[in-house]
Amino acid sequence: MIIGMFFYGENDFKAKDAMPILDESVSSSYERKDATNVETAVSEAIKEHGKTYGKREYITEGHVILDTEQKGNKVKAYTIASVGVFEFQDGIFTIVSGSGAIPTVMTFSIDEHGQYKLIAYEEPLDGEAYVESIKKMFPKKYDSKVLYAEEYYDELAKQQERQAQEYLKNIGRHAKVSISYVEKQPLNISVQAMNHFLRMLSSDPFLNECPDWLGTREVIEQGIRYVYETSQSKANDGRDVVTLRKMKEDGTVIDMRQYVIEENKLKRIK
């Protein structure tokens, strides 16, 4: 039985740059390190897997290694792992996607240079199959740990927070780091108009980058940081106006759209 298994044929972890590397395909970055020990290999594998959580600025991870087994040049690591993906929202470097504490088994091969290569990344199945799949993945002696993996989450979240803080230090940015949801200011429009707005966001590449709240989010595109802003004002006739902007860090406007609320729909006026 295959249990939430991901196979990686050519995924070796070698030293790159001292600064975080931007992955152009998914616009998420993390600091890659030379994986010549299982601790680093596990960390890198979780962050690589974190790319599946979507386009964001920086990937962090937290993990606890319960045990390892080695047979020949193969190493299996029994872990509890968590992914945390961050971006700037309203000036706060906040977690926007990721996972809880997930019992995870990783298998690596070790090449002639001592580099670890990820072969398989196993997570338990969801729903009713969750417990049974964990029992198939882990030795029975770890049942008391992996069946209550959520008890490790605070520890894993602290690891993610430290990595996020280190990333900000590396890019020379001073900002608050939040590992929990940050309350947003919603648009002051009707439910029907908001639903129409959300449908628009999902169908337009520019709008899709804009916040669905009154505020800002930052996106790195081809190595350049842009600020997307959603704001609301009143027209001279009293109608609500929603303005969406894409700006450089210095405030230079690259793109802008304005919509007026009419009959619970957004009508473009600029």
Residue ranges and their predicted role:
Residues 4, 8-69:
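N-terminal "first-domain core" detector
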Residues 29-58, 176, 180-223:
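Short, non-transmembrane alpha-helical segments in secretory-pathway proteins
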Residues 66-78, 107-117:
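A short, structured loop/turn motif at beta-sheet edges
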Residues 73-89, 238-244:
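A short hydrophobic beta-strand element
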Residues 83-100, 248-256:
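Short, cysteine-centered beta-strand-loop-beta hairpins and adjacent loop/turn segments enriched
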Residues 101-131, 247-270:
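A short, surface-exposed interaction/processing loop segment used at functional sites
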Residues 119-202, 264-265, 269-270:
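Low-complexity, intrinsically disordered terminal/linker segments enriched in charged
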Residues 191-270:
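A eukaryote-biased signal for long
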